[in-house]
Amino acid sequence: MPRRRISLPTRTVEATPIEVPKSLQKKAKPVKDMDTIIAQAKAMSEKYAGQYDCVTDKDVLIDYVDTIISEKRTGLDTETTGLNIFKDPVVGFSLYAPGRKAIYVPMLHLSRFTGKVDPNQLPVEFCAQQLNRLNGVPGMTIDYFNAPFDMNELWYSMGVKLWDICSNDASLMMRLLNTERHRNNNLKDLHAEFCSHTTRGPRFGELFPPGTFNRCPFKYTSAYGARDAEMASELVDYAYGELRKPENAGLLQVWETIERPLIPVLLRMREKGVLVDEAKRAEFIVKYRGLKEAAEADVVHEYEPYIPKINQWRMRFGRTKGKIIDMPVKIGSDGQLKILLYDIMGLPRPESGKVDKHALKEINHPISAAILRYREAAKMLSTYLEGLDKFLHADGTVHGGIKQLGADTGRTSAVDPNMQNIPSHNREIRTMYIARPGRYLISCDYSGQEPRLTASLSRDAKMIETYQKGQDLYSMIAAVAFNTTYEECLEKRPNGELYLEGKERRGQAKTIVLGICYGRQIPSIAEQLKCSVDEAQLIYDKVTKNFPGLLRAQDESAQMAHDKGYVETLWGRRRHLSIMMHDPYEFRYKDGCNPDFDPFDPEGFSDSNELSEAAKKKYLGDLMSLKWRKDKNEYIQGLVAQGIEVKDYSYQISEQSRKCLNARIQGSAADMSKLAMIEIDKDERLKKLDCYLLLMIHDEVICECPIENHKEAITYIKEDMEKVASQLPVPFKSDPETAPCWYGQEVDIEEDGELEDDGDGDGEEV
């Protein structure tokens, strides 16, 4: 439990003493192997003896904070009992002031003798007062590794809100520098490789199993804790050194204008939270339980005739590993489903041999359709309905987190709960997220964000002109592809009636454009268009001939990746695709096989496995001239027989080449959406209206606003969203909707208080 009950979303720092959590007031239960854990911590402490300080004296902490204020910079890290920012308290924190030893400040470590909080530590309230002194210091910066976690923990556990101080997050900075290399690395790994150039130290989990850190004497844990703050600052210095190189000017701009300013924006969004309609949630739980049970009954109905075979199988194999099947069959077990579908029912086994969504659709049998329905209902229940219990706060709100770099493209992702992944055909579930009493939710997303970005990246004159005229791009492309007028390719007639033929033509044009953006081959496009390959090729050729910028953007993106190992967005963000720098095939002699290698020439050792450039060029040319995989494999085997190793990158290059243009589009969309959030968050006009951000779902921002202010707020939100792309050649539009709940009946902003159904859209690009 947290030390003091928080009241979200209007929490303010209170003057009342911060209590020790009840869970830490009780005598701790014994932990197995605690002696071993303490011995390991002691050994580490002795290794770094004299390099770090453990501070348990108030005057020493005051003096240290004075130094930080004077230097206007510190590294900061927290140590907690767990990863739940709302429940797991900070037991100690570390600071690193330039020119001084890093320190660890213990607060809630347990005594080995009493099992209760050791009294020989600094009080939480006093520590909070000292940390809060950093607020308001002009030019102050704090270095973190995973800033959102530490900043949230300090706030919800200690009442210390450092959100308005300039924050450097080494984790984000290193991820920006290389989206491939630093995706999963942690502080210890990165610091060892780029700063200390030594073998990394032990990670937290390697030294301290869950729930044991604050059970170790703080004199032994201080070195571990203090080092984290020091390493975070040193890694920030390294990252800035890289970002400030001339060739990385675009990345530096992304950090300083997008990622760093976004950190406190996302914290404020999580703090506000969104209200859940419990009555509607209960209604959906009943509905989806019924759907799950019905789907399960359908599955049983389909395999019922095979029960004798199932029983024979069970008699034959019993509990043999890999052969187990229960009765009734466990629908949630992939292993049992494989046995049921492929071994017992004899359904055609897909090439993958799996029972995932794609495989089940390929099987195309009533039982596979029922399994898919079962899984979807189960997913809705476990993730978005029943599973919401663990995220609900006492006031009926959920405070989900947002991973700032949730994807390599720069897109955010939602966690705890993941509200981004609610399927569009189950969007009714979104209606259980509601505005607080007396308020509306304002949802605003970009109209055709990705095709507009495609036009900007392609610099195609016709595409740009289409948008500048306020026309629909896909309809214009469809008119060219099908030799008809623009009006015949719109989804609706001038009177508002749905025009099915126009909608179909527009949809086919959209398929072609997206096919180019996603690097799809003609057969794949033909399959989506439901036409022959020849017909798809004709349409494709006509579109690319009339809109040459599409293929130009595709080629330029692939060439950029080949030359640099990454592609860039319109704002300078990078998506690394390093395989693109390789040749499709690379050659080298096996050890000792180079006929020109002279063992008595010391300068020749480095090239002992290298082929001549002429040989490489010949072999590569030969392989590229072969059309069929079988012929390529035979050629490669011939080289292997000569002692030449061949590395085949062709498949990986093919895969990554399809991502090049799409990565630039998706990354540019991420940049735009993040800039929009920053603009909305800092807009003083919206603050005066008490309108604030709640959620970001892909390119859709969701704000909450008092009912009486919603018209004015919409004007400012649209303005903020559209101006972030004002430097691009294509105008961007945003479409606002106002409702009492997410995806509810839209409020007509022309007439106060009246509701009208927003329908399924107006034919704009998605």
For each predicted feature, which ranges?
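Nucleic-acid-processing active sites and adjacent nucleic-acid-binding tracks
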Residues: 98-142
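C-terminal structured "cap/appendage" subdomains that terminate the fold
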Residues: 683-738
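Short, low-order "capping/linker" segments at domain edges
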Residues: 742-758
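Conserved "right-hand" nucleotidyltransferase catalytic core of DNA-directed polymerases
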Residues: 2-113, 160-165, 182, 190-194, ...
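Acidic beta-strand-to-loop metal/phosphate-binding motif
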Residues: 75, 139-150, 441-443
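Conserved beta-strand -> loop -> alpha-helix junction used to position metal-binding or nucleic-acid-contacting
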Residues: 161-179, 186-189, 470-474
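Conserved pre-motif C helix in the palm subdomain of viral-like polymerases
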Residues: 227-234, 658-681
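Short, amphipathic alpha-helical "recognition" segments used to contact nucleic acids or chromatin
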Residues: 507-518
